[in-house]
Every structure is written in structure tokens, then in C-alpha cells.
Design a protein with these regions (language model features):
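Interdomain motor-coupling "hinge/lid" segment immediately C-terminal to the ATP-binding subdomain
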Residues: 9-10, 15-138
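Loop/turn-to-beta-strand initiation segments
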Residues: 2-7
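Accessory nucleic acid-recognition modules appended to NTPase machines
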Residues: 87-235
């Protein structure tokens, strides 16, 4: 007799990529869960603004008051992100300090996973890539450069580390496209790319930006606006 079983887990991409891993082909349906989008965030924290936002159809200009409220919500989303625990806590308590603690705990749990699930010889390089992400994205062009990890570093030394982070769903790699034509993969340059985090709020936390910086728009929209905006679009 067959039974329908629902399972949840993390690092599945890493587990399935291991040599010798067995899998019941054709018997499993996958559902990948991502951080909440901006729309889902609005629905969770401000149902009134969410309703107004969903009524925008592009046929008429957005009222100035509504536009201002949406910009403020966007700034807050850049700092909060879409990790479910962070959004849920903020929706209930509106405490930014608690949100930042949750984000830091998530980042710490990622680091613990590195040591738990990676071969010992690869651990240092995974940490080097991970710890360099915010600095890579803070640059003007935000292109990933191995030399920014360590002087004299080469691609072949860090390819497996980047692959692991991507398979784990912690970062996403975006290759440069030489020509905007389909299929995009035919015009992709694998040696020119950017690495983004899976959640813009976690990136904001890695930048050590406070919620006040996000809401006031000072440091957020001068030093790191481009990086956070690009990560938001990707997300």
C-alpha cells in the first residue's frame, strides 16, 4: 500500500548532489519555499495598505499619499526582508530590535551549517566566500572578484565553495549576459557574475545597517542602495 507523506527540510540540494545518494525517481513532488515577497509582507503587516496596493492597475497615477506610504513600506521591507519568523514577529510586536536578533540568529545558524555539512578541507573557503559577500556587493559594480577574498585567489580554488552555497539555497548566482536574447544561457558569461543573498533583510543585517537607517533612508540610500535594490529585485 502506498502512503502520501509530506516532508520538510533544508539543504536538500546539497544532499541530493552527494555522490551515491539514492532517490525515488518519479515518486516525489517538490515545492520550494522562499522568503516572503514584498506583496506577501504587506499582507502580513498592513492589510489596509495591502488592499490599496492590490487595487493599483497601472491605468491611473498612484495617489501621492499612497505612493509615500508604499515607499516607506518598501524601505522597511529592505531592512526586514521576508524570512517568515522575522515577518511574523514584526507583525505581532513591531519591535525592530527583536527582528534584528532573529536575523542575526539565522545568519549564525547558516555558519553552523557550514561546519556541520561541509568537508573539512572546504570549510575555510566557504566561510571566506560567505564573509566577503557584503563587501562584494558594496562595490560600485558589485561584480564578484576572487581577489577580494584573498590576494592571488583563483576561480578553481573557490568554485566548489560557491556551488555549495548555491545548492544550499543561501545565495544565488547571477551570470552576466552579453546580449539580451533568448535563450539567455547561450549568452551567459560564467566568469563574470554576482552573488546575492536569499533574503534582502539578511543582506541588510550583514551590512550592519540599523532599522533607523532603513526608515530614514540616509545610509541605506547612499552607500548601499544599489546592492539592496538589486537583491530586492532578485528576490
Amino acid at each position: 500500500r502506498d502512503y502520501a507523506i509530506a516532508c520538510a527540510g533544508s539543504l536538500l540540494g546539497v544532499a541530493l548532489n552527494r555522490q551515491g545518494a539514492s532517490f525515488p525517481v518519479g515518486k516525489v513532488d517538490f515545492m520550494t519555499l522562499y522568503p516572503l515577497s514584498f506583496t506577501e509582507y504587506l499582507r502580513a503587516v498592513d492589510t489596509g495598505l495591502y488592499s490599496s496596493y492590490m487595487m493599483i492597475d497601472g491605468s491611473m497615477p498612484v495617489p501621492e499619499v499612497l505612493h509615500g506610504r508604499l515607499i516607506e513600506a518598501y524601505k522597511a521591507y529592505l531592512a526586514l526582508g521576508g524570512m517568515p519568523e522575522a515577518v511574523s514577529d514584526f507583525a505581532d510586536n513591531r519591535e525592530w530590535q527583536a527582528v534584528q536578533t532573529i536575523q542575526q540568529n539565522i545568519l549564525k545558524s547558516y555558519s553552523l551549517d557550514f561546519s556541520k555539512h561541509i568537508n573539512n578541507k572546504d570549510i575555510p573557503r566557504v566561510f571566506q566566500v560567505w564573509n566577503s559577500l557584503q563587501d562584494q556587493l558594496a562595490k560600485e559594480d558589485r561584480k564578484f572578484r576572487y581577489a577580494d577574498i584573498q590576494k592571488g585567489a583563483r576561480a578553481r580554488e573557490y568554485e566548489s565553495a560557491i556551488e555549495w552555497l548555491c545548492l544550499a539555497g543561501i545565495v544565488q548566482r547571477v551570470n552576466m549576459i552579453e546580449t539580451p536574447r533568448l535563450p539567455l544561457s547561450a549568452y551567459s558569461k560564467s566568469n563574470a557574475f554576482k552573488l546575492y543573498l536569499n533574503d534582502v533583510g539578511l543582506l541588510c543585517s550583514k551590512f550592519s545597517l540599523s532599522a533607523q537607517s532603513a526608515l530614514s533612508g540616509n545610509r541605506l540610500f547612499t552607500e548601499f542602495k544599489g546592492a539592496l535594490s538589486e537583491n530586492y529585485v532578485l528576490q
